[in-house]
Every structure is written in C-alpha cells, then in structure tokens.
C-alpha cells in the first residue's frame, strides 16, 4: 500500500500537507490545484496497472461530467471514475474530450461516442439524446431511456455493510444518507442506499433500532448534520452506516470534536472506499466500489458499442465488497 510519504514525494509537497489534505483539514491554506494533485496522486498510487495491447487506430470519445472540479474535491468518487476513464483512453490511444452538460457541443460534435458520468434529469436526458451517437451512462440507470448503462449494485453493498454490523453485535444503527439534485435543479435524486436499508430492515428477524439522518454528499454536509445531531438529548446508536465516505470523513471530525471515540464509543462504516479512506484515523471500514475499474470498463464498453450495428440495451452492474479496517468495534 502506498504511504503518505510516497504521495508527498510524487506530488512534490510535504508529508504533513498530504496528511492534512487527505483528512480535509479546513485550517490548511493550499490551492485547489495542490489539493487536486494530491488526490490524483493518491488515486494513481492506489491503482494496479493492467497490461493490455494498444489498438492502432481509435475514435474520439466525449466525456460529459456531472461534477465540476470543486465538487470532485469534495467527494472523490467521481474523480476516481474520471481518472479511470482517462487512464484507459490514454492506454488505448483514444482521443478523449471532456465537458459539462452546460457546455455540451450539440451543434459542433466531433466525437464518435459519448460517456455520460453522473445523474441527469429528464430535460438533460432529452438534450443528450438529441445526438445520434453510441452512448454509455455511468453511475446512472438509463434503461428507461433505452440507453446503455454501467452501475453499481448498491443494494448488495448495503446488505454487506449492515450484515457486518449485526454480526458484530450492533442492533442500534443510525444511517446517514445523502441528498442531491440534478444540475438543472429539476429533480431530487433519492439515495438508493436508504431504500435498500429499509428493505434490509424489514427482513430482519431481530428488531433493529434505527435513526435516520440526511446530509449533502460532502465532508461538510456530514460534519454539520452529525454536529447538530450530537447536541440532541437521548441515547445514540452503537453504529452509524454512512452512504458515502465523504460524509463519513465529516462524521469522524464531528465525533472527534465531541470527544466520542471511534470505534470504542461509536462504530462507523462508510461507502465507496475513496482513496483517502485507508489514511483516516481510524482507518475507515467501508464498502469498496471499483471506481477506477468502472471508468476503465466504460471506455471498453463504449468502444464495443461503436463497432456494433445493432445492439440490445444493456445494463452492466458491478458488485461492491466490504473492506474491513479499524472503525467498527465488536460488541460480542
């Protein structure tokens, strides 16, 4: 595993700076460019290269991004997928251009295929579908639009997380789920992991005491919600399941400020396994989503679609897995 020193050396900054950036230290004064470089180096060192032959002649792919640069820094999930896309495109010699939907070149399209990364409203989908090119939607189930998609089996990940907590004696569980809107503010996006949580809860033989909290999918979102929640009276659950590692980082900060020890006083389990999760204190137990591989696979799948005259709409689903580290305590 790469160390803080490895990241610092490649990013050309001090180990202390790396540590503070990876832990989202708000008192640190460094540029967004430096933060971006550190996060990208952390992703790069976390990546295991796969040797594949480069094709001689490849077309151009347009990547439509949902997140902007600042949002990528707040939640590394989409940064990691994007880097996987860029890495695979470079490996195969594919020309890749990147834009946000607001800059979508409808009247000046030179690409041969489109990868759309993120969540999109009906209005936004109508814009994208005006272009008669092969398309692949990543992290967005576009089957109802008759478009190919590549998604994560969030339900399976939720089951793994919650079964692990119960196996360790936790029957009082809080869930911090995320809330977000499409970029045009036309649609609220439900957190499918909260829905999966409810289905899991309904199937349990033993009663599960549940506390439900909602925040933005950011470090600060998790921090603010947990900080306010801790001010409330009453007993607290023995464990928190948090549907994104970014919110989990904010949660850890709020708990530390309240002198609540993780995992001795409260256990934490996250979701995504972003590159900084292993560097937190304690190292975060989380559900690993193969984000880099999703990015790589999206390039390969789109290239395959480009060579097919007729295709049946396909949804590819990836299974996440539990990464056991240090943030969950056994009560047995």
Spans of features found by a protein language model:
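Alpha-helical recognition/docking segments in bacterial nutrient-uptake
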Residues: 2, 58-163, 230-231, 235, ...
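Hinge/beta->alpha junction and helix N-cap segments in small-molecule ligand-binding domains
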Residues: 69-75, 100-102, 150-160, 176-227, ...
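Periplasmic-binding protein-like
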Residues: 110-117, 174-177, 212, 233-244, ...
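Flexible loop/turn connectors
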Residues: 231-332
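Alpha-helical structural signal in soluble globular domains
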Residues: 41, 84, 88, 192-204, ...
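N-terminal helix-turn-helix DNA-binding module of bacterial transcription factors
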Residues: 1-56
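Short beta-strand segments enriched in small/hydrophobic residues
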Residues: 19, 55-71, 172-182
């Amino acid at each position: 595993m790469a160390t803080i020193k490895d990241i610092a050396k490649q990013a050309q900054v001090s180990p202390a700076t790396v540590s503070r950036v990876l832990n989202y230290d708000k008192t640190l004064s460094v540029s967004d460019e430096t933060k971006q470089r550190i996060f990208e180096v952390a992703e790069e060192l976390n990546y295991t290269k796969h040797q594949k032959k480069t094709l001689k002649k490849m077309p151009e792919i347009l990547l439509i991004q949902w997140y902007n640069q600042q949002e990528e820094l707040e939640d590394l999930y989409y940064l990691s997928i994007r880097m996987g896309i860029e890495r695979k495109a470079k490996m195969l010699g594919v020309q890749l251009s990147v834009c946000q939907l607001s800059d979508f070149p409808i009247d000046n399209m030179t690409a041969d295929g489109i990868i759309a990364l993120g969540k999109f409203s009906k209005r936004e989908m109508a814009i994208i579908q005006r272009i008669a090119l092969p398309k692949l939607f990543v992290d967005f189930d576009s089957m109802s639009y008759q478009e190919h998609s590549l998604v994560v089996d969030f339900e399976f990940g939720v089951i793994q997380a919650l079964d692990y907590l119960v196996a360790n004696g936790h029957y009082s569980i809080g869930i911090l789920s995320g809330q977000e809107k499409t970029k045009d503010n036309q649609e609220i996006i439900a957190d499918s992991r909260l829905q999966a949580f409810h289905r899991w809860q309904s199937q349990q033989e033993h009663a599960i005491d549940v506390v439900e909290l909602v925040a933005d999918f950011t470090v600060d979102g998790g921090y603010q919600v947990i900080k306010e929640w801790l001010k409330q009276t009453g007993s607290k659950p023995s464990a928190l399941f948090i549907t994104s590692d970014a919110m989990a980082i904010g949660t850890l900060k709020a708990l530390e400020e309240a002198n609540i020890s993780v995992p001795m006083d409260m256990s934490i389990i996250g979701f995504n396994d972003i590159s900084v999760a292993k560097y937190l204190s304690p190292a975060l137990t989380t559900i690993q989503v193969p984000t880099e591989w999703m990015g790589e696979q999206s390039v390969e799948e789109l290239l395959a679609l480009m060579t097919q005259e007729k295709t049946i709409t396909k949804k590819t689903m990836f299974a996440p897995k539990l990464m056991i580290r240090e943030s969950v305590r056994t009560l047995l």
